[in-house]
Amino acid sequence: MTNFRLNVLAYSVMLGLTASVAYAEPTNQPTNQPTNQPTNQPTNQPTNQPTNQPTNQPTNQPTNQPTNQNSNASEQLEQINVSGSTENTDTKAPPKIAETVKTAKKLEKEQAQDVKDLVRYETGITVVEAGRFGNSGFAVRGVEENRVAVQIDGLHQAETISSQGFKELFEGYGNFNNTRNSAEIETLKQVTIRKGADSLKSGSGALGGSVSLDTKDARDYLLNKNYYASYKRGYNTADNQNLNTLTLGGRYKYFDAIAVLTSRKGHELENFGYKNYNDKIQGKTREKADPYRRTQDSALLKIGFQPTENHRFSVVADLYKQTSKGHDFSYTLKPNTQYMTYDEKELRHTNDKVERKNIAFVYENFTETPFWDTLKITYSHQKITTSARTDDYCDGNDKCALAGNPLGMKYNQDNQLVGKDGKSAKYQDINKTQVIKERLPFTKPNGRWRFHKVDWDALKKKYPGVPIYASCLEEDNDPSEFCTYEVKTTKKENTFEINGKRYDLLSEADKNVISDEQRLPTNVSYLFSCDGLNCDKKTILGFKKRRNLLKIFLFEVIEKRCQKYGKTKVKANDQLSGPYLFMPNKKGYQANLWSQRDLTSETKQINLDLTKHLELGKTQHDLSYGGLWSEMEKSMTNLAGDTPLNVKWWAQYPHNCATFLPPSTMTPNAKPTLNPERTSTLCNNVNVFSFLIPVKTKTGALYFINDFRVNNYVAFNLGYRYDRVKYEPEYIPGKTPKIPDDMVTNLYIKTPEFDASKADSDPDELSKKEANAAANIKEIAQPKKFSASSYSFGTTLDPLNWLRLQAKYSKGFRAPTSDEIYFTFKHPDFSIQPNRDLQPETAKTKELSLTVHNDMGYITTSVFDTRYQNFIDLSYQGRRDVHGHSKLIPFHFYQNVNRPNAKVTGFEIASQISLGNITKLFNGFSLSYKYTYQKGRINGNIPMNAIQPRTAVYGVSYVHPDDKYGLDLYISHASAKNAEDTYNMFYKEEGKTDSTIKWRSKSYTTIDLLGYIKPIKNLTLRAGVYNLTNRKYITWDSARSIRPFGTSNMINQDTGLGINRFYAPERNYRMSVQFEF
């Protein structure tokens, strides 16, 4: 039914266009038809305008030219004004093949607030969902994340650690913020979305497409005045987000500047039914979205200096910081506390951050020379850090386990244990003897002696385990008919009395109050803070094991880290026979197990971009050429530790936190011994390590593009780019964060040999192990070079005034990331070995489009075919023995390899119709329609999960002739994701025979209504209703973010409990108010 509706609309629009051409008033040259004018004339003529200009090419539009500048420069100024502060594309003009341009005005009209909103009303491109970390790049034509290039002002943004082995080992556990960074929408002047191979513009990574983000410039606002000011205040109910953005621009003589300051504060995105779900449920079956507090702060600063009309200097600072703090209630690992119940339990706290800083210096030259018309040199220094901080602790203070003191235990001035009432505590551990007289009747009258007449077996059954000796207290001549026997029983009494109440320490019920862990044997020494003891007395009163008597323990006072401690002396030879000390609980603090994982990408880049217009005979040529050089350092730093919180007076401090203790002086040739206290939480241990070898990437590139028109009917686009990439690992032992030894030992180099069983306790064996690890890392970390050629060939044919044919053939590539080459891990169940022989991935796109257009609008249909080669994927390499490990445990090895091929095909429809051209009654009204269908397979039969199901977006828009108000209605439809188009790569490990994904998205339709009004010149009010019909639905990107294993983004795969957490929000609203001067 959906396809039928789509086809009816498509053909109806096409017939309407054709009819409007046939019955239009005759004219020799419609305003948007080919003319004999040069190709650099007004932009609404259907020329083959450059489709692959680099995003950082010169913008030869100075704003502070002297008043006597020539008319050509004035035209250029007018053009830049159009591209910045208003729409830069004629919505009636036919689009370029596989390209969508969105201006700041378009984004404002769509009320976009993040990158997901950039593509909300687009088809064929979506945003990758990453659970608690938000979004991670885009998915286009079957590929995603690093295979879709993302640039901001010509700079590549941070890539994820794309090694599939790394993802399987770490990504499912919520410890790494392994996502691609985003951008602040309010700072963007223009967004260009290109589908298909696109390395000509973006270099490595543009296999499925690219998204180029260009930031605002003062010249966008200061054409007809010397200042600009704007303030916007907004609110979104879906995530309770508050928006504040201030834009200031000004010009004085030769200087101009702009500042865009934006702040967003909100919470988690509220899923459908958010207010109805139980907030207390923890684990993977939780249906309510996990709570987070999110902030995003951005500052874009640009200062320009233009002393003459041909020379311009600029300084740029683009600062962006995004934070998210909250709780992972859906985290699947929870502690199990035996016998004890507490008001508060351990909880995972999250603190994630993405920070980007870019400082750039730009020089632009507008002097026309034989070699260029414009020249632009840009130096950029960008640093991007993605961080994930997790803290696992109980934040209920004294309500938490091991921190409470419900009995109010403390030591008084005499160092005697007392309770809340101030009275001394009492302890008793004795065996209490009891004598019971049993009167046993004669049951055997024929017995010779008195004790022969008694059934002693019955008495033994009554007192099992008690010795019974056949004898009677009465004499044999006693006339009585019974036998009296004294049974001696022993009952163990183990009690603790405090606050006037006695607790039975043998009772399971009382273990909730007094547990075995609260009794400290004195066969070892303890170190207590003098905050809880009277250290001036230097004695402490404890309890003997079997009698309710006090025992004096001597201790010495020592001072460490400016704090005094009392160190008790050993008072017993073994744990069972010695006396006891009682404490409120064992630890006396809350342990915070924390980790912070930072991924850093730091780039230094120089761009040289030139343009030149040539007329050769009757042909018009627009040349773009130049190059770049960049140096990018990518590294990982992992910090992990164990920190005490809410430390109490009874906490047992370690005597020594060193890893090894000095050798004994009593034993000849003794070696240092491993310190058992080295792992104590009170040592505040911090480990610094990394799973990745730091790598410096050097990239050089040259490109040349020629857009030329042969005549009014034929135009071509030719481009070529050469990239050279070199990886230089920079692992320096002792300085670089350490790679864990066990990940690499004996992988390639077998010497020096060491005894793995003694390496953790013997310093000599540990040194050998570290030397072995260093040798293997050196063997792995060898430089690697890649080179790649990218090209594009396009043609545009305009055989008729209303018909356009476009064809494009392009090639893109993606060099293997450093982690795909060098990542190493060693474990019997899952070992990964590096692969220095990986080849670049390549993509070749063939696309053909047909466009019918006139003044009324256009409808474009296109078909495409993209072939991917050398796809990098994880492959099982088999089992083998590893030197230094038991041969009984073979290691399972995996490795990144190049897969042969993948293929994606599909077709798209895009249309934009202005109804005012049909009748004046519909002036201001327009219709739009977009549709995408695509299908893809890897190696011929494996579905590509990144492909979206069929999607369509219908649009109805109205804009007042004087732009005083406007309305937009969007109807978005997505078909169900079919099972045969999904692939679960873990189905064999899960013991399944079906390789499809069980939980998928169903068909859904949503309606959004957006509008704005300008009651006065300087004021704009905007509002929007999203999911107007309150439809419950889940997108395919959200559904496929559910992980089959791990601790994060999990649901119950059998019942589906927890999947509601991934559903889109209910009906929600956005509103904003903006003042402009």
From Swiss-Prot:
Region (Disordered): 25-72
Topology of the protein relative to the lipid bilayer: Multi-pass membrane protein
Region of interest: 11 X 4 AA tandem repeats of P-T-N-Q: 26-69
Span of domain TBDR plug: 89-216
PANTHER family (UniProt xref): HEMOGLOBIN AND HEMOGLOBIN-HAPTOGLOBIN-BINDING PROTEIN 1-RELATED, TONB-DEPENDENT OUTER MEMBRANE RECEPTOR
Family: Belongs to the TonB-dependent receptor family. Hemoglobin/haptoglobin binding protein subfamily.
Protein name: Hemoglobin and hemoglobin-haptoglobin-binding protein A
Annotated organism of origin: Haemophilus influenzae
